[in-house]
Design a protein with these regions (language model features):
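A short glycine-rich beta-alpha junction/loop motif
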Residues: 1-4, 36-58, 236-244, 275-300
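Short, ligand-facing micro-motifs at secondary-structure edges
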Residues: 1-2, 15, 28-32, 186-197, ...
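Well-ordered mid-protein domain cores that form the structural environment of catalytic cofactors
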Residues: 8-9, 17-35, 51, 262-265
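Short, conserved charged micro-motifs
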Residues: 13-18, 57-61, 251-257, 298-302
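Feature representing long, continuous alpha-helical segments
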Residues: 15, 212, 255-259, 264, ...
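Non-catalytic DNA-recognition/assembly elements of restriction-modification systems
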Residues: 56-166, 298-337
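Sequence-specific dsDNA recognition surfaces
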Residues: 152-167, 183-213
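Beta-sheet entry/capping signal
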Residues: 177-178, 215-217
């Protein structure tokens, strides 16, 4: 773990301590201990000044068990994704990236050099677009898949939405849409502190920012290619214009899209589309051009898809358990009469 993460070693009821730390009242205490004008931080000794309620053991155990169950579901969700990834690799006969042989002019050199035909330039003069590893991966896909199409194929996606740049107007929670940035899309329960004005941004929200369950999200600048599958509890959230929204053709392909794009080979094909001299980015057209395999065995493709959707459902159930634990803490401890 990073040196910038404080680790609490709990003697018991670690789930209860975790739940307390997530509570808004205790978060306020933590925020009051922050110091630093440029880089804000807290120190381990500051935590000794944070008060948490000493609830009866029965309530501590109840909250602790809910949090532990929530984390068990997260582990099960991750295991399902690993299983789906393994099926994809096996069906496409994908070797580890380090074992894929690529054609370079002089293999003895540390810097790769390679030829590109003028007919294959595709309007791109940047070397990263033409890396030999990309052609090698595509060749493997063509050899082992029934067909290699692109993400923009209407059988794969309805559309890829790139929101325009706009000045954001934030309001209080009751007047706005919950707003997520690219950094939050990998979290189960992002800390939503920003709410876009419904009065000002309604039209843009409906057309470009709104997400629904099983939409595939892809970060399009900065750290390019982080992929997420929208869980049920993010329904109707607004997601930053720095995140592409891939609308699957249907739920029979949504999970499979997520598994492929988040795979090692899928990530290379996706990031290959990167352009920009100062700020690296991809856009909706770039994502639509990413090569995408349709498997020979449709039963395996369906199994991969179903595993991803099951994993997404488990993430939602994990979220509900955590919310229940937070509710118990509020109602039976902090605000108990």
């Amino acid at each position: 773990f990073s040196q910038h993460i404080i680790r609490l070693e709990c003697k018991e009821y670690s789930g209860y301590i975790y739940c307390c730390m997530k509570n808004q009242n205790i978060q306020t205490q933590l925020q009051s201990l922050i110091y630093g004008a440029v880089i804000q931080e807290i120190e381990p000794e500051h935590l000794s000044r944070v008060y948490i309620p000493n609830a009866p053991d029965s309530i501590k155990a109840k909250i602790n068990d809910l949090i532990m169950l929530s984390y068990d579901l997260r582990d099960e969700s991750n295991a399902l994704i690993d299983q789906a990834q393994a099926l994809l690799v096996k069906e496409l006969n994908l070797p580890p990236i380090s074992e894929i042989k690529v054609d370079t002019l002089d293999k003895s050199k540390s810097v790769q050099t390679f030829n590109v035909k003028l007919s294959e330039m595709a309007g791109r003069a940047d070397a990263s677009y033409h890396m030999p590893i990309v052609d090698a991966i595509v060749d493997i896909l063509k050899k082992n898949a029934a067909e290699v199409t692109t993400v923009g194929d209407e059988r794969i996606s309805k559309s890829v939405v790139l929101a325009g740049v706009f000045k954001r107007t934030y309001v209080e929670e009751e007047y706005g849409y919950p707003f997520l940035g690219g950094k939050e899309i990998t979290q189960l329960n992002p800390k939503t502190e920003k709410f876009l004005s419904k009065a000002i941004h309604k039209s843009r929200y409906e057309k470009e920012l709104k997400v629904t369950e099983n939409t595939v999200l892809v970060t399009d600048r900065g750290t390019i290619g982080t992929v997420a599958l929208v869980p049920k509890h993010w329904n109707n959230y607004a997601v930053s214009q720095n995140v592409l929204k891939l609308i699957p053709a249907n739920n029979d392909i949504a999970g499979y899209i997520y598994v492929f794009l988040s795979s090692e080979c899928g990530g290379i094909l996706l990031r290959r589309q990167t352009y920009g001299s100062v700020v690296d980015m991809i856009d909706n057209h770039s994502l639509e051009m990413v090569e995408f395999p349709i498997l020979k065995n449709q039963d395996i493709q369906k199994q991969i898809n179903d595993l991803a959707l099951q994993a997404n459902e488990k993430r939602y159930q994990a979220y509900l358990l955590e919310q229940e634990a937070l509710k118990v803490l509020d109602e039976e401890v902090i605000y108990a009469e």
